[in-house]
Swiss-Prot record:
Belongs to the peptidase T1B family. PROSITE patterns: PROTEASOME_BETA_1, PROTEASOME_BETA_2. This is Proteasome subunit beta 1. The keyword Hydrolase applies. It comes from the Archaea. One of its GO terms (biological process) is proteasomal protein catabolic process. It is found in: Cytoplasm. The gene is psmB1. Keywords: Autocatalytic cleavage, Cytoplasm, Hydrolase, Protease, Proteasome, Threonine protease, Zymogen. The 20S proteasome core is composed of 14 alpha and 14 beta subunits that assemble into four stacked heptameric rings, resulting in a barrel-shaped structure. The two inner rings, each composed of seven catalytic beta subunits, are sandwiched by two outer rings, each composed of seven alpha subunits. The catalytic chamber with the active sites is on the inside of the barrel. Has a gated structure, the ends of the cylinder being occluded by the N-termini of the alpha-subunits. Is capped at one or both ends by the proteasome regulatory ATPase, PAN. InterPro entries: Ntn_hydrolases_N, Pept_T1A_Psome_bsu_arc, Pept_T1A_subB, Proteasome_bsu_CS, Proteasome_sua/b, Proteasome_suB-type.
Amino acid sequence: MSYEYGTGATAVGIRGAGYVVLAAEKRVSYGGFIISKTARKVYKITDYLGLALAGLFADLQAISKILRAEIEYYNIVTGRRISVRAVARLLATILYSYKYYPFLSETLVGGLEADGTAKLYVMDPLGSLIEDDYAAIGSGAPIAIGILENGYSKDMSVDDAKKLAIAAVRAAIERDAMSGDGIDLLVIRREEDSIKAEEESITI
């Protein structure tokens, strides 16, 4: 099997004042054959941090498992909460260490720091690390990014950010044959003195 047939997807991320929204569609396809219509590409890693990925599905699952294990190990050894920035830098280092046999994936890391500051990072398969306010990855990214650029503002509410993320993924689904079959969302937000992560699934 050629790798080019297993790497399609669309995922987006948006950060705002006290929140991060991650969203991705659910289709896994190989060439013209749809393997699954219910695949999860958005992962809640902790109550304050999540991933959205696009690429070869086995690699998406592997990355989420590796990161969960590394975070748990850090928590046990130090007894402290690892920051979102540190997680992003750790994952970038892990991805770069596999540069000769890379994970066929693009990754969004989003979450809230202990003080409520929202963070969103974008990574390519080799671990190049960019912090941004919004991003789109995967085969549908050229379509989704236009929707994000047109609709994003720094002072938008979390509800408006959810609507924008859904609109961006939906637009990609309509034009990208490798994306489809619904949308999974993860919303991480600050509520008073706590951070809350909410997962949602939308049928299209």
